[in-house]
């Protein structure tokens, strides 16, 4: 089964949300307190997905707000050089800064992230700064859950979703749950559900679906049946090493294994999964193959130091799939 898009649209994907700075520990197997050296990368789930999509050959655009400083200029320059259209990146004029994420790599199984997300520029994107024409020209709008955490970013995303629905643009909701950006589980569930019920494709881990449903121990069947009662026609639920599942509204279920790799760190997997899965759908591959692309891409990224810089090419993904098929 294949997923279809409006081929007349100029952009394959437009992502909206945060673009920030990742500072990844260069020294492995030691705590943050003893780490002295970090490498700088562009970070943030929607930015990573846009970068990953562009590296795979898709026409990708980005809507977001960046600081008017060296970090903001680094983010815009890096994304533009990787092929992402940055004409809708708004430069903040009120002194807000970029979000910073310091990563600690104690072991492949034990990684943590120290986040600085107070008063960050990306959460100050205004609804008036979202271009209807830009979104109307995309096959899909990629929404990140974290962008719903605070106003005015929350309203900007809801406005973007309205524009997408108006212009027959597919809405892809990447749940991207980060607990440190939310006030309560009730708040998260309300806004996640609001967007998920307007989305055509919903992607997340089983734990993230439980967060959206404000419950524990939920089942895939209950989750997809609820979403299929609204706008969704494709739901992807990831189960870590057990692999991932895609459910279509027509009743088909697809599964992809988790590909074996030498794991360096655990972060970055979700963003690489989403970009490669989306690439698979847009390039005309069937849903099962798109799942394999997502799973293989995630395996590649967790074996490397960065997230954005490590996003693989289609050839690298295909080589891994072939090697383990």
Swiss-Prot record:
It is an enzyme of class 2 (transferase). Keywords: ATP-binding, Kinase, Nucleotide-binding, Transferase. InterPro entries: Carboh/pur_kinase_PfkB_CS (IPR002173), DKG_kinase_firmi (IPR022841), Myo_inos_IolC (IPR030830), Myo_inos_IolC-like_sf (IPR023314), PfkB_Carbo_kinase (IPR050306), PfkB_dom (IPR011611), Ribokinase-like (IPR029056). GO terms for molecular function: 5-dehydro-2-deoxygluconokinase activity; ATP binding. Pfam families: PfkB (PF00294). Pathway: Polyol metabolism; myo-inositol degradation into acetyl-CoA; acetyl-CoA from myo-inositol: step 5/7. It catalyses: 5-dehydro-2-deoxy-D-gluconate + ATP = 6-phospho-5-dehydro-2-deoxy-D-gluconate + ADP + H(+). Catalyzes the phosphorylation of 5-dehydro-2-deoxy-D-gluconate (2-deoxy-5-keto-D-gluconate or DKG) to 6-phospho-5-dehydro-2-deoxy-D-gluconate (DKGP). HAMAP family: IolC. This is 5-dehydro-2-deoxygluconokinase. It comes from Bacillus subtilis (strain 168).
